[in-house]
Amino acid sequence: VHGMIKHREKGVTPFQYAVYYLVGFIANFFDVLGIGSLAPTLATYKLTKTVDDDLIPGTLVIGCAIPVILEALLFLTKVEVEILTLVGMYGCGIIGALIGGKVATKLPVKALRITMGVGLLSAGALMMMSKFGLMPLGGNAIGLHGIKLVIACIGSFILAALLTVGIGNYAPTMVMVYMLGMNPAVAFPIMMGLGALGVCNGSFPYFASNRYHHHAAFAFTAAGVVGVLIAVYLVTSLPLSVLQWLVILVAFYTGITMLKQAFARENVAKANVG
């Protein structure tokens, strides 16, 4: 935070200030709900031209570090999770980011997005069927054991690896937790904790090289903290049934978004060739 203030840019307009703080609040509020903050923030910065393209990656990673850490800490204190499940999924997630990431970066991103998008839409449909009593999914467990714990750990490994190529882990983690019979609230400390670990590691190179917009990063952090506090209170106050519907909506939203991203890249490439 000291670095953001000390090296802040001069000549920032009131419009830019408004964008920085509004984006910080709104993006982090919805990040807590599992929708994610990086993609909408990147799009807003590009649309409003308030942050140079080469500074956007560093601004996003540095700006969201403190809010994501706060999310993780708040959910860890407010949501009960069995320690074996938490440590197992955290550990496999860290290993997945370090080892699995090397494999994931060699795979075609388009194919990964399509696979994940179709998977999320299919899972969303199954979860919706369970809400109407057509499928035996969901539950209220706060921990996993046996084969279910193994599946969860393998899933955390894979999702953390995919995170290194820009495929978010929030929605898939929520879906995995739901389908393994756990309380949907348990997904929040798990996915936020893994996100915090990844963001902390990723922010150091940008901070050291000073490749980020200081005003935008500070505003994203300051307003983001407020957004996180409000959203965490709302999420932890929601009844189980509402949380289950939230997971279903996030699954459909993220699945459609991933498919659009996959085919949008292809259409852009064809247009450039034409």
Model-derived segments and their meaning:
Residues 75-83, 131-144, 232-241:
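Membrane-interface helix termini and inter-helical loops of multi-pass transporters
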Residues 10-15, 133-156, 266-274:
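Alpha-helical multi-pass membrane helix bundles of inner-membrane/thylakoid proteins
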Residues 239-249:
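Loop-to-transmembrane alpha-helix initiation sites
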Residues 14-93, 149-228, 232, 236, ...:
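Small-residue-rich hydrophobic segments that form or flank transmembrane alpha-helices
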Residues 6-15, 50, 105-111, 211:
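Membrane-interface helix-boundary motifs at transmembrane edges
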Residues 1-9, 101-109, 118-140, 253-270:
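Transmembrane helix exit motif
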